[in-house]
């Protein structure tokens, strides 16, 4: 990247710094841009020129070796969000503006990032979880000096049951600590009742994402003994795959809780007759009901479902009836040509046939 380009990016980030002061809760998601940045670009620009708030930049400067993990955490969250919602009316697509505008100049998820809906809740939770997962993995891989394996589990076990702690347990507590330091913006720094409610909601959902990673920690063991007798086992704690964490958060999304939009000492359920039911730290919370994702809304940046591919025989969310919102669907035939019946010919090449197939593709009207 040449000097002129770097200077232009620096000026753009200075503008973002001013916006962060004016709109703190709305700018919380700028770091997510790192998840779609080209490999090596964030490291080349340096912490000062990235679309981060002042606290994040300071933490980045003190721990620059964590930048690859931050980028990987954002990538994990973005990818899993798209995977979990790929068949839904809202499919967690990155906005076109975010991919074409200069670095961080447009919110990655557009309207949903600051709408206070169930979709906002999932985005914040899965991105926070991605950061925990990525940083913890880096610790276990030995990529950082200040964290490694979970040292609290190096001793102990159960002699009577024939196992002891060993190996390298994932230090998820360090990942959670860093995620809180990097993502959680103090509520006291905001003005306006609406801002405070939305920020409190986002902070809660950040923590819900972190709790999902911790909740799905599992124990792996390796056997030791003559001829595989497993007389003694060495065990360690490890994080689940991020796909499994995504499934848990999707379930939390389906059962998310609407909270009151009025500022109180603590968040309350919106429905008065349910306020005695406690809100748990691993619940996903939202303030506003989701918009109609069936039809295009250019003002909100909602593309609608017209033209989306659907499954004619499915009764689920990907089925044409649900995805197309009752508008019906178009069917067209797609011709596929691929190599098939490949054989190795001595010596030395592979000979294949060209096989054609026709497939019906259904798209929403």
UniProtKB/Swiss-Prot annotation:
Keyword Endoplasmic reticulum found: no
The signal peptide here is 1-29
> Which SMART domains does this UniProt record tie to the protein?
WNT1
Lipid tethering residues (O-palmitoleoyl serine)? 227
Task: List, alphabetically, the GO terms of the cellular component aspect.
Answer: cytoplasm; extracellular region; extracellular space
Q: Does the keyword Disulfide bond apply?
A: yes
Q: Give the PROSITE patterns listed for this entry.
A: WNT1
Quote the tissue specificity entry. Answer: Isoform Wnt-16b is expressed in peripheral lymphoid organs such as spleen, appendix, and lymph nodes, in kidney but not in bone marrow. Isoform Wnt-16a is expressed at significant levels only in the pancreas.
- How would you describe the post-translational modification of this protein? Palmitoleoylation is required for efficient binding to frizzled receptors. Depalmitoleoylation leads to Wnt signaling pathway inhibition.
Instruction: Tell me a Gene Ontology molecular-function term this record carries.
Output: cytokine activity
Give glycosylation sites per the record.
143, 189, 311
Task: Supply the alphabetized keyword list.
Answer: Developmental protein, Disulfide bond, Extracellular matrix, Glycoprotein, Lipoprotein, Secreted, Signal, Wnt signaling pathway
Q: Which InterPro entries match?
A: Wnt, Wnt16, Wnt_C, Wnt_CS
Where is this chain primarily localised?
Answer: secreted
Give the record's GO biological process terms: bone remodeling; canonical Wnt signaling pathway; cardiac epithelial to mesenchymal transition; cell fate commitment; keratinocyte differentiation; keratinocyte proliferation; negative regulation of apoptotic signaling pathway; neuron differentiation
Q: What is its biological role?
A: Ligand for members of the frizzled family of seven transmembrane receptors. Probable developmental protein. May be a signaling molecule which affects the development of discrete regions of tissues. Is likely to signal over only few cell diameters.
Entry's family note: Belongs to the Wnt family.
What the entry lists under PANTHER family is as follows: PROTEIN WNT-16 (PTHR12027:SF70), WNT RELATED (PTHR12027)
What is the recorded name of this protein?
Protein Wnt-16
Source organism per entry reads Homo sapiens (Human)
Q: Which gene encodes it?
A: WNT16
